[in-house]
């Protein structure tokens, strides 16, 4: 089951590459769009981390059977962890790419200057340029609601399934040290962090995709 990133949709490079890889193995695979993303209904500016996590849990509950391997990209890796905390008995393993746990703080709020923070508090919703295409729509409610789901301020993350985290050391959006912090808090002794020295945030190059599928294959075979 694949969980995409903030503003991404299920037609992205990693989602479609994983589906193709799974089809080739006869492996079941689920990809979906959060509300306000891609083909799903809803307004993006009204979405929250809690909403999108609940939607991922609903997909897990309604569209899958038995223990599942979750693959989460960026924000999707944060949501992947929230799903695992909510449904531990349904999770066989987690594979996170450029894990953006708590990104609403260090990637959104903390990068706004005082002028933009004042504007966001007045207008509730603002747009910011994105290096990946369409401008980001930033809603104050997204940032405020996300505080309920923060992970990096917790002493421990009681997740005991196998976990693999892959992070590019040239990630200009989410520092690779975020994945280190997540790894340190996980209860699972079977946790590994793979750093890609020249990897950037999207991890969508052919070499990145090969690393992704190889790592996922190893997790499936070790179950």
Where are each of the predicted segments found?
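Conserved alpha/beta-hydrolase "acid-adjacent" motif
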Residues: 172-178, 204
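Conserved alpha/beta-hydrolase
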Residues: 19-41
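Short beta-strand/loop motif that positions the catalytic acidic residue
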Residues: 158-159, 165-167, 171
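Catalytic nucleophile-loop/oxyanion-hole region of alpha/beta-hydrolase
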Residues: 37-63
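Catalytic histidine-centered segment of alpha/beta-hydrolase-like enzymes
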Residues: 199-211
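The serine-hydrolase catalytic nucleophile loop
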Residues: 6-19, 177
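Hydrolase active-site cap/lid region
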Residues: 89-138
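Active-site nucleophile elbow and catalytic-triad environment of alpha/beta-hydrolase enzymes
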Residues: 135-155
